[in-house]
Amino acid sequence: MLTGADRIAADGSVANKVGTYGLAVLASHHKVPFVVVAPMSTVDPDTPDGAAIIVEHRPADEVTRIAGKPVAPAGTSAYNPAFDVTPPGLLTAIVTERGVARPVNAGTLRVLSAGSCNAEGPPADVYVER
């Protein structure tokens, strides 16, 4: 399964449209690879992990009204996040224009961000395809 990302934290956590996390859980349960495809500009090394990603909350009436008509009782509140966050443990890989980070973790993303590997190759716990 392929998906995009609006933001990727330094540890590989991915913020994307609501529903991405649920799809990743299902893919993991059914042993289907779950791959994020996004440009390197999406990776934010200053955001350490998924908990640090600020998730925008949309107006409640986006889900309590349809075409201007109420679909919930008056005064009903609604939790309406614009994104959800998928932890790196549910991802098979992150594909960027610089290569493929697999497994998804801070080490593989650092190697991709650096743009090159040393002559001996990446450390043993880091695997990056170019």
Regions found by a protein language model. Give the residues of each.
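Conserved phosphate- and dinucleotide-binding cores of soluble alpha/beta proteins
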Residues: 1-130
